[in-house]
Amino acid sequence: MVQEKAEIMDQEKFNRTLTRISHEIIEKNKGIDDLVLIGIRTRGVPLAERLAHKIEEIEGESIATGLLDITLYRDDLSTLSEKPILNKTEVPFSIKNKKVVLVDDVLYTGRTARAALDAVIDLGRPKYIQLAVIVDRGHRELPIRADYVGKNVPTSKKELISVRLSEIDGEDRVMIEETVKE
């Protein structure tokens, strides 16, 4: 059983975090020329869309977004199930020489980010790839770090970070949850 342990971000803090990350992306990339955002399914997709919208509000110009399904790139595919559920990758633009920002909700072991890097490289050769996450919870198993982090939240391995999004969960909120024995 999982129970809520603490709230990390309420709706207001969540929105402020997305605004800050949007400004950081613009600043680090010296504007939005050749900039694209690609959300990692599932929760990275609405986050990428929201960041793109905020960047458009700031810069007055829209940027392209896509979505990435990393299922076949996972290194734990054989342990997931015999028939993994595949979703479509939708990147309706060339990534050649683009500044790609991968977007996900939580950075943990680094394995999802590694799979996403492999998936992007299969689409072409971008100028570079950056990573934006709402929460970095530590416990890396691979040498991967995010370029943009909403909040660093050190956790124990038995704790979970739950990023709730209005598009999926009906609310914007980040929680620490803990697995408890019944």
Curated annotation (Swiss-Prot):
Gene3D superfamilies: 3.40.50.2020
Alphabetical UniProt keywords: Glycosyltransferase, RNA-binding, Transcription, Transcription regulation, Transcription termination, Transferase
E.C. number(s) listed in UniProt: 2.4.2.9
Biological processes per GO annotation: DNA-templated transcription termination
Matches recorded under InterPro entries: PRibTrfase_dom, PRTase-like, PyrR, PyrR_bifunctional
Pfam families: Pribosyltran
Complex formation: Homodimer and homohexamer; in equilibrium.
Family under the similarity heading: Belongs to the purine/pyrimidine phosphoribosyltransferase family. PyrR subfamily.
Protein name as annotated: Bifunctional protein PyrR
Organism from which the protein derives: Natranaerobius thermophilus (strain ATCC BAA-1301 / DSM 18059 / JW/NM-WN-LF)
Lineage, opening ranks: Bacteria, Bacillati, Bacillota, Clostridia, Natranaerobiales
